[in-house]
Amino acid sequence: MKIYHVEAGMLATNCYFAVNEAIGEGVIFDPGGDYPTIKRMIEQTKAKVVAIVLTHGHSDHIGALAELRKATGAPVYIGEDDADCLTQPNRNLSFFIGEELKNEPADHLVHDGDVLELAGMKFEAFATPGHTKGGFCYYYAPGKVVFAGDTIFCESIGRTDLPGGSYRALIQSIKTKLMVLDDDVKLLPGHGPTTTVGWERRR
């Protein structure tokens, strides 16, 4: 797997494109906004988008979803408890950026322990509530990489003061789902630089 990355949208959300180069297919994680930038990244890879996976439903992670979905026809995956974020602006908090963001419902609802088999790759779904009720991280074990959304950042954690947030739940999620992984597992956050489990464990 090769991972491509752009910062997209006014909050510089990390959008990742995980590509299986052997078959020319890939998975987009968190198309946060600025569709033209995401489109250019995809075109440069020459890979086909076969799935769009969302770590959670906040507007800064789904801002370009409608355009990407229309352009690719790829199915959308989101945690069950964040599903209504796609259709309800009050849940995705788009009013914070002066918009009323609405999308069609997701094609697939993700549950803790699910294994998403996409583009010839397997991603383990870890429910990590705390930043949102339905937040998820996705672990690609062969590459020792976690697409972590806003659960954890380099030397920080996601906000818990927004609707559906819980500091206690977030800390529990990080301890039981992420800190049990090997030190050299990379954490690809929703904002800011990449970190590792080992680095965050030593903090």
What are the language-model segments listed below?
Residues 1, 47, 119-121, 183:
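Structured loop/turn residues at beta-strand edges in well-structured enzyme cores
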Residues 1-45, 137-149:
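Conserved beta-strand hairpin/beta-sheet module of binuclear metal-dependent hydrolase folds
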Residues 18, 55, 128:
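Conserved S/T- and glycine-rich ATP-binding loop of Class I adenylate-forming
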Residues 22-23, 33, 59, 134, ...:
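Short, glycine/acidic-enriched loop or turn micro-motifs at the edges of active sites
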Residues 33-118, 203:
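Active-site HxH/HxHxD metal-binding segment of metal-dependent hydrolases
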Residues 92-95, 121-203:
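Metallo-beta-lactamase
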